[in-house]
């Protein structure tokens, strides 16, 4: 029989209609001689009623044999429920069954197919095809499809060209570790799976495509966390002849359309812009969450004369004020915050409480001489908690930024209904890597330096600024972009600043440098992390919830057991030898 419609779409206007439905048994109940079945499909749940007085003995026997997750086909007449179920979109109707057949049976599932299950993550991933049957998971992927549909429509209307770039590319330094693919034809040589289509999309601009986009899989072999996966999807854009402001305008329009199409929300344009230095100094993060206050405050000048060497001898002293919540933090609670501070490189965490117009706490005795100045500088009020970090500027900012976010979550200070977009601009071109002992690209080595600071490529790299911009949503980096270098001499200077010899630059990027001999236009673009964007729209805190078949925190797939060992024959064909491994 042909399916008439989805079970989840049956409504009161279908009363009296004969229909055929197909789906899974969610639940079976026997009440007063009648059998009630919740039939579930992609669109929702529909109640079926089997009355022994209205069906054949064989249909009744089949109904009695049904168990959860059996796949069935059922025909009958839509009728009004005696008592509506307001919790279901189909709650006003039910199907009086006339015909019923089993299309497939099912073993008992390792967890119930319903929202709010308590199964651990690896069990959910081991049986991902069952996990994806749950309504909330299906909704996540409907949302994802709406997002990509909205993006494609928007960019197509702006005459962007959707172009596929290679999955097998050249391994290049400056970034996360590559996933390498050995070549059988070219023995001893390796492809890399792309961390992004960065260079190829730039070459498309040199080819005259003018406006390119792609919704593309990318790969990075890096340590995993809640908003990272080894393979991920990004919305990749590149344009020619546009300014950074014009590119940002296009991206803002795209996001506004997605928010309207998927959430029914109008977002205010243009998005706020914040300089990188302001973000770090005021929020302790280059991806600040602006849904709550508790900004970092610099007290270096206020405390420099106190008789407390931790403060007076520190490079900077900064603080955050937790307003009207001092009573929520015992000494034990503050000790936990101190341990977190140490994880970010701080030597410790000083603190005060303010009540009855006076300060108290372990360091209060050192600050009595400046109590009035401190109270005024921090605008202290009754029941405030003050947390101090005295260290380098970088450590103070990062530590207090992390504490700010943690405390806001603990105290439920965040309005989760808000979607606060903003641009972070005026980026440094380079950042110092303690691990590498050198400056590295803050974004990538193809970012255009500002005209005012480009001369420092041969001088103080800390002073070079980039024509770069990150878009941030609710404390997450949603995406990043920049204008690109299109002049060969500037690109060669950039490589030299990063420590490349002329020979190594030619070996790694010779094809790009050669392309710059042939009229490379001014260009720039941006990439947005699609998984992260959908995660935030869906109100989730892990991108695994919006990726159909993700990896776990060990970069493994519990369902397929990937990665796995391969046969000796496969290794021999590739001239590879595995020296050692652990099962």
Curated annotation (Swiss-Prot):
Residues covered by region (Aspartate): 198-201
UniProt keyword list: Aminoacyl-tRNA synthetase, ATP-binding, Cytoplasm, Ligase, Nucleotide-binding, Protein biosynthesis
Primary localization: cytoplasm
Main EC class the enzyme belongs to: ligase
Gene Ontology BP terms: aspartyl-tRNA aminoacylation
Aminoacyl-tRNA synthetase among keywords: yes
Record's catalysed reaction(s): tRNA(Asp) + L-aspartate + ATP = L-aspartyl-tRNA(Asp) + AMP + diphosphate
Sites where the protein binds L-aspartate: 174, 220, 443, 484
GO cellular component, one term: cytoplasm
Subcellular compartments: Cytoplasm
EC number in record: 6.1.1.12
Gene Ontology MF term list: aspartate-tRNA ligase activity; ATP binding; catalytic activity, acting on a protein; nucleic acid binding; transferase activity
SUPFAM superfamilies on file: Class II aaRS and biotin synthetases, GAD domain-like, Nucleic acid-binding proteins
Binding site residues for ATP: 220-222, 229, 477, 529-532
Similarity section: Belongs to the class-II aminoacyl-tRNA synthetase family. Type 1 subfamily.
Function: Catalyzes the attachment of L-aspartate to tRNA(Asp) in a two-step reaction: L-aspartate is first activated by ATP to form Asp-AMP and then transferred to the acceptor end of tRNA(Asp).
Subunit annotation: Homodimer.
Protein name: Aspartate--tRNA ligase
Species this protein is from: Streptococcus agalactiae serotype Ia (strain ATCC 27591 / A909 / CDC SS700)
Lineage: Bacteria, Bacillati, Bacillota, Bacilli, Lactobacillales
């Amino acid at each position: 029989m042909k399916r008439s419609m989805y079970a989840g779409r049956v409504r009161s206007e279908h009363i009296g209609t004969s229909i055929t439905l197909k789906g899974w048994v969610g639940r079976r109940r026997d009440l007063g001689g009648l059998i009630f079945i919740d039939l579930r499909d992609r669109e929702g749940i529909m109640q079926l009623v089997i009355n022994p007085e209205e069906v054949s003995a064989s249909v009744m026997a089949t109904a009695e044999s049904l168990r959860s997750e059996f796949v069935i086909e059922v025909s009958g007449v839509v009728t009004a429920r005696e008592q509506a179920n307001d919790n279901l979109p189909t709650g006003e109707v039910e199907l009086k069954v006339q015909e019923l057949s089993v299309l497939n049976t099912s073993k008992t599932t390792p967890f119930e197919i319903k929202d709010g299950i308590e199964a651990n993550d690896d069990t959910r991933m081991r049986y991902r095809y069952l996990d994806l049957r749950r309504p909330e998971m299906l909704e996540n992927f409907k949302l994802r499809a709406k997002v990509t549909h909205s993006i494609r429509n928007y960019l197509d209307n702006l005459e962007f060209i959707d172009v596929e770039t290679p999955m097998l590319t050249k391994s290049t330094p400056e970034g996360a570790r590559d996933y390498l693919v050995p070549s059988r034809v070219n023995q001893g040589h390796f492809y890399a799976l792309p961390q992004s289509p960065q260079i190829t999309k730039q070459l498309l601009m040199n080819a005259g495509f003018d406006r390119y986009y792609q919704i593309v899989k990318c790969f990075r072999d890096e340590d995993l966390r809640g908003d990272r996966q080894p393979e991920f999807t990004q919305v990749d854009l590149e344009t020619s002849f546009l300014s950074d402001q014009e590119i940002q305008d296009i991206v803002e329009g795209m996001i506004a359309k997605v928010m309207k199409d998927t959430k029914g929300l109008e977002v205010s344009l243009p998005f706020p812009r914040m300089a990188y230095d302001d973000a770090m100094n005021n929020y302790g993060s280059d991806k600040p969450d602006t849904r709550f206050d508790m900004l970092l405050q610099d007290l270096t000048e206020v405390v420099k004369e106190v008789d407390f060497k931790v403060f007076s001898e520190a490079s900077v002293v900064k603080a955050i004020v937790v307003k009207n919540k001092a009573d929520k933090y015992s000494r034990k609670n503050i000790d936990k915050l101190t341990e977190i501070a140490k994880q970010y490189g701080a030597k410790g965490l000083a603190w005060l409480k303010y009540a009855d117009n006076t300060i108290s706490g372990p360091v209060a005795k050192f600050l009595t001489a400046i109590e009035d100045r401190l109270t005024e500088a921090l605008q202290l009020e009754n029941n405030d908690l003050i947390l101090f970090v005295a260290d380098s500027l970088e450590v103070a900012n990062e530590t207090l930024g992390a504490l700010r976010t943690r405390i806001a979550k603990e105290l439920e200070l965040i309005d989760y209904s808000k979607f606060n977009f903003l641009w972070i601009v005026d980026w440094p071109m380079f950042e110092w890597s303690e691990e590498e002992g050198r400056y590295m690209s803050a974004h990538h080595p193809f970012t255009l330096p500002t005209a005012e600071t480009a001369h420092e490529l041969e001088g103080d790299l800390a002073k070079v600024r980039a024509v770069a911009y990150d878009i941030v949503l609710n404390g997450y980096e949603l995406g990043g972009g920049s204008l690109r270098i299109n002049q060969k001499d500037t690109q060669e200077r950039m490589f030299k600043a990063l420590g490349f010899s002329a020979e190594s630059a030619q070996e790694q990027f010779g094809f790009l440098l050669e392309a710059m001999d042939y009229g490379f236009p001014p260009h720039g673009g941006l990439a947005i992390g699609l998984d992260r964007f959908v995660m935030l729209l869906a109100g989730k805190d892990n991108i695994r919830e919006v990726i159909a078949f993700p990896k776990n925190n060990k970069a493994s797939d519990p369902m397929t057991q990937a990665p796995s060992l391969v046969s000796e024959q496969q290794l021999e064909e590739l001239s590879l030898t595995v020296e050692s491994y652990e099962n």
